[in-house]
Structure formats: C-alpha cells, structure tokens
Amino acid sequence: MGDTTSSEDVPENKQKSLKFEIIDARMKIFKDIVKSKSSESVKEEQIYQKSLEFFDEDLKSSEESVSNEEIKTGSEKELEPLNVFDIILIMLQQLPERKKPIGSLLSKWILMNFMNWMQDKQSIMEQQMTEYYQKKAGLACVKEPKNEEYLLQIFKISKEFVIDLRKSKVQEYLENQKFKEAAEIVMKHEVVDDYSFEQITLPLILCDKVQIVDELLKISKKLQKSYISFLDQFVAETDETVNAFFEPYKEKGMVTINLSRFHGKSLTIFMQKFFNGQVKQFKFDLEERRDAPKFVANMKRKALKYFVGKRFEDHEMNDELFCEHMKSTLPECTDKTIVQFLILLWDTCIYERRIEALFWATYSNIDRNSKYMPPDLKEELENPTTEMKNGLEKLQALRTTKNCQEEDEQLYVFEEQKKYPIRIVQNEQDLEILLSELGELEEGMYIGYDSEFKPYHLIDVSTSRLAIIQLFFKDKAWLINCVAIDNLASRDDVWIRLYKGLFESNKFSIVGFDIRQDIEAMFTVPSINKNFKIENIQNVICVKSLAENVNALSMDILNLSTKTSKLSVLADHLVGLKMDKSEQCGNWQCRPLRRNQIIYAVMDAVAVFEVFQKIVEVVRKHELDAEKLLVESHMITVKKEKVRRDCKNISLIPWNEFYQIIHTHRNPEKPLQKPSELKIVVDTMVLGLGKNLRLLGFDVYIPRDVTELKEFLRKMDKMEESEQRLVISVPSRSYEMLKSDNPNAKFVLIPNIYEKVPIDLVCSFFDFFNIDISPDQDYIKLNC
C-alpha cells in the first residue's frame, strides 16, 4: 500500500502550522487595537504591553523546546527548536495593514519594543542568533527597507551586508525574468539609477507592465531620457528594422506586448500622448527637440507634406499662408527633411511645383552636394533652363512684398466703417493700458475672448502654445501678442498680471466659444501653470455650451436646424455676421502679423461677444431663466457635467446635425485620414461601433460571434500586408486572450465603452485616428 500520511501529519508541518496559528491570533489582537478609536498614545501603550507578553511567551516556549531536546525521539529530533528571532521576523511579515501608514507605525512600535525587551537578555542572543536568522533579517530589510534601522541593531548586521543581499536578490530576479519584483526592490531602496534601461525598464515595457514603468520614470531623469531615446530610434523606420530589434527578446520569451505600437503612425501617436500626458503631468525633464530628434523631424516632415497638400491639391491655402508656414518650418528642419520636402515637390513633374522646389532650395540654402539631393534637381539648381529660371524669378518677385501693418497705423475690425478700433498689446506699457481699462469696467459686463495657437510641430512640451489672445469689450478690440510677451525679460510678471486681470475679477465675465481649449492653452504658459489652477476659474462662460443648453430646451428658441453649431454658423444666423475663414490655416507664430491676420483674429472675439449677447437677449425675450442657463454654461460646469446623448442609433440623427458634431473631432494641423483608408475588424464587444463606422464609409469586417472572429484573425495572420486590418477592441480579459493568440495583429483599444453612448464612441474613434469627412461625401448612409 502507498504512504497515506498527509502533509499535515508531518511533524515539521505540524510545528509550522502551530507557529502560524499563534501568530495569526496575535495579529487579530494587534488589528483590533489599531482599528480601535483610542488615541495613538493609548494604542502604542496597548501594543507595548501585548508585545512584551508575546515575547515572554516565545522565550518560555523556546527554552522549553531546548530543554525537551534530549527526550525527543525519531523524526522529532529533526525539528528546529522555537526561536524568538524567527518569530519576530514572521510577525513582521504578517502584520495587519502593513502597506498603510498605520502598518508602518505598528512595525516600528513592535521592533522598538523587541529591542527594549532584549536589552537584559544577552544569553538569548548567544543561544538563538545564527547566521541563518541574520541572513533572513537582511532579506527582510531588502524586502522592506523602512524596518532596516531596527533590524540592523537587533540582528547585529551591517548596512553593507544588506546591500550585498539586495544586489544578489535583484540579480536573481533579473536572471529569472522576474522584472517586476526587481523593479520594486530598486524603487524601494532608491537605487533606480544603478541599473540601466536595458536591465529592468525595457523588459518591463516588453511584458506590458506600464504602471511600473511609469513609476520608474517618475523617479529617474536618466531613465526618462533613455526611454524617449528608445522610442525615438524607431520613428520613420521600416517594419523590418523595428522587428529585427525585438527578435532577440522574442526568442528569450520576454515579449508579451503588442509590438505594433512601435511601428509607424501608432508610434508617433503614442509619443505625442506621452509628451502631452505624462511629461506634462509629472514634469519630466524631457523636450521634444532635445531628446527626440527623429520624432521632431518626422512631425515637421508630415507638416510640410500637409501644407503642400493644402496649397496645391486641396487649394485651401493661399500663397501668403503657405509661405509663412514654409519660412517658419524649414529653418527648423534637418537637411534630410528639407530635401525630402523638395523631392515631394520635384517628383510630381508639375511645372508649378518644380518652381516651388527651386524657390525653397534657394531660400533654405541647402547644400547642393548633400547626399540626399537627387541628381536632376541638383543639375537644375546649378544650370537652370531659361523656362525654369524665368519662373523662379517671377515667383521671387511676387513674394518680396508682405501685407503687414504699418507702424502707427490704426486698424479696425470693420475697416470700411472704421468700426471697433484694434489695440495691440506687446509690452508692459501696453499691458498697463489694457489692465486700466479692464479695471474701469462696470459690474456685470462681458468680454469676448478667443486665442490662436502656434503650429504644433514648432513647439516643445515645455513651450507655451499661445500665439495671440483676442479680447473685445466697450467697442474696442485688443490683440495680445503672446510671442512678443514671451520675449520680454519680465514675461513671468506680465503673464501673472494679465491672468489675474482677466480671470480673478468678480466684476465681469469672459465669454468664448468652446473656450476650455483656449484656457488649457493659457495654462501651457509656465508661470501661469505654476501659480494657478484651472478649476479655480469662476468667471468664464462657454457660448457653445450656452447655445446647446438653449437648444436642449427647444430648437425653436434660436430657430436653429442643429443642436450643435460652429461659431461662424451662429454668427451668420443670429447677428448676420459673415466670418471670413481664409486665414484659418494661418501660421500665428510668424511675425510680423499681416493686416488680414490681425483683423481676422479679433473678428472671432467680436463674433463670440455679439452671439452671446444675442442668445441672452432671445432667452430673456422668451421669459426663460437666463441666470440659470448662464450658470449651467460656465466652463467648469461644462467640464464636470458631461452632456449625455440618448440616441441609440446614429442613423436616426439627421446628417447635417451629425456632421456638425463629428467634424469638430479632428485636428486640422495634423495629417488627416479618410474613412476609406482604414481597414478594420471589430471585437464582438464593439459590434455596434463597427456597424456605425460602416455607415460612415469605413471598411469594417463584423464577425457574427467570437468563434468567427478568432477564425478571421487566424486567417489574417497569413494575409499580405495590404490586406491586414486593425482590430478594434476594449481593455478586457477577452482582449488579452486575443492578443496572446494573435501576437502579430495590431489592436486599438477603446476605453470606457460602457460609459459612452454610440455617438460618443464614434467621436472617440475619430479623435484617435484624426478622421476627416466632408459634408457632401456621397458614401454616407445616414439620413439626410
């Protein structure tokens, strides 16, 4: 017959079980004490008395264990005698609430009590202290350094001994690919910089331990730079190059993450979010230009391509705007990026664009012997044909003049009527005048507010986005030249005074259209971000929200056809103001500003002011509670109270209304994608989103069930690159299984789906992929 003795019957296990039963009972007593409502001093005294009681019990048990050693027989002789040092170490491991402040305090009390108790018990030290327990105490210090001060004294071990154990333990974890455990030790002991990015951080990235990576980055500037350099090396690289880097790690079984995030557009989006997210939030010591040169070059290359498309293909950008963008962007580019831009123009073989290539090659003074320069373009630069030479000279002559404001010239919002003079603020003296006029405003007045931003590809994460701020009040428009202010030696003081003058006044309110993004841009100014909090602003009203709140009561009040409208639509409909949008793609960082730019910019502040006044007038005419609507339209209210749309099927929304909503979910300063350019397969948890995307012209594969989805993904793994589809899923256990089974598939996760109605899900999708749709595209299947 086989041995039927259970593990619980083994004497060694019986001893261990009894030991832990005793300690468990003690922990319950300690927990009751720390959870009681007694004062801290009372708790400390109770812990002290109980600790001494327990230590005496352990001593008595250990002495009895030793004295009984001679009469033990058989397997009993193999048992270790009870040891007070063993018990105290086990108690530390089992303490209640040990990860909370009260747990730390409890461990401190118990260790101090043990030290006091041991003072007159030298014989116990000689009898029961062994190298085994000293090493065990050293490992306890490695695991929890906050107890180190007391354990070093109790167990008579040195700091160097603990350091050696720590290094050995970390190395053991690394060799066994327990990178999370290794990271926890180096963070607790504040020795993160003793280990390279490749030793701990990179393996954690590859096994998708994002939270631990974030904690490491918060601690170490060195790792921050290593991390962004790691990402930057893959920008604009081929799939083969990227895959080759990770192959050795895959062979070691270290890769569980979806590597698609390190390829192409997924990588640049990820890096953008990193710079705008963690870098800003935790104030990492990182700057795009300094620490991610390939990322910056790629952004500029994309921007140049975008401007060429807008100028020569879409015909939405005039020559003045195009030149401004080129003159701001090209000096910031490397020779390689400039030549790529020239080739983009030259290789079209279109005369007009080839002249442009010659013009910008001459303007940028590019080295004609650059290894990137194509031979035919180099030849044309050195020996231009008569036709090309004449075309170049004509273009150069055309671009020698610029329509700028003359010095001391008074500009008006409406030039013909000389209505609403424009005042420029660009130094401390100008600011004094503005603040003085703000101070003279009467109680309850309103100020129209708008701002324009610098091109995204020309700023760093630490750079203010603001290019200009426009104000309108008392029939006068103000344009604040933020670029000029940033160049003042006293810029910090100027910004703080301006902020206080605008946003800390109880006399007036500021009105803007979709104004939160303007205020968030204001908080990219370092001195403002450092000294103020956006949630403390109380005097800002969102006119877009006000119009939507009125429409929610009845569409007949403002007599609008859609619940959500652009400012230009509201201005035209409510006050008969037709807004010129020819400068919409302008470069607001370029100086000096042109006359048309200045007038265009301040027009938005005038428009939002007049639209606001008209809405309030109409609301009061209908005898509605205007004050309640204004409170509900405050910027902070908009942030906190998300408007829910209860439409379950977007096909029920009129197309013109749907377009007005979805069209705002894109960034025209970045490359746009058309629905037809994306191939998608949806997880079974987002089938509704898939159906709605199909209505909008996306190429969507919608599986009937999980089985069909898994089968499709298996087949897709063998398809050509051109036939691959993005897999749209949600963070879940099902996604983890799909990702594990299909490591080559590219997944995109849509978070918080259960908190969003269908149209919000579509908006999230458009935000992520920067989708552009036209109001008259014929593939749309929604109601018209």
UniProtKB/Swiss-Prot annotation:
The keyword Nuclease applies. It comes from the Eukaryota. GO terms for biological process: nucleobase-containing compound metabolic process. It holds the Pfam family DNA_pol_A_exo1. It comes from Caenorhabditis elegans. Keywords: Exonuclease, Hydrolase, Nuclease. GO terms for cellular component: cytoplasm; nucleus. This is Uncharacterized protein ZK1098.3. Residues 422-619 form the 3'-5' exonuclease domain. The keyword Nuclease applies. GO terms for molecular function: 3'-5' exonuclease activity; nucleic acid binding.
